[in-house]
């Protein structure tokens, strides 16, 4: 009799632990509140502002075969893809979120990131994107509408 009760208590406790751990928000940061960003996310907001202002002098010197407009288009696509990857990862790993950007266009996202970066040019670009995601959260699409 005692072993049946003990098994049930263990089962209930196991179910409770599974529910609690899966319902908790997931933060990919270490104990010191730090994280590692790849690619564009490692750049500073000052670099992003330079890019938005089409100040690509160092790239122009490094890649003379491209025009300034061609370089801007290349960098623009790299930045867009990095942002899209970040937002996709967010959608995958955050509960109750199907599409964090909702109806926000990529151009609007980039403009909002510029505003965030102008407020703190020394922060990493990844931090600016995190700030943007926090701003977008209230208007996120929570579930697939099936359209």
Stretch-by-stretch model annotation:
Residues 113-117:
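Individual transmembrane alpha-helices with interfacial aromatic-anchor signatures
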Residues 11-23:
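Bacterial N-terminal signal peptides
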């Amino acid at each position: 009799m005692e072993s049946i009760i003990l098994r049930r208590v263990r089962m209930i406790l196991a179910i409770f632990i599974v529910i609690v751990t899966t319902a908790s928000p997931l933060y990919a940061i270490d104990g010191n509140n730090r994280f590692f960003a790849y690619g564009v996310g490692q750049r500073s907001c000052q670099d992003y502002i330079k890019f938005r202002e089409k100040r690509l002098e160092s790239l122009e010197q490094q890649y003379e075969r491209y025009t300034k407009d061609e370089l801007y288009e290349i960098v623009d696509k790299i930045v867009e893809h990095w942002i899209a990857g970040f937002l996709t990862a967010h959608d995958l790993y955050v509960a109750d979120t199907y599409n964090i950007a909702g109806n926000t266009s990529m151009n609007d996202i980039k403009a909002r990131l510029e505003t965030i970066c102008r407020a703190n040019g020394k922060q990493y670009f990844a931090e600016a994107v995190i700030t943007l995601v926090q701003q977008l959260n209230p208007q996120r699409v929570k579930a697939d509408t099936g359209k």
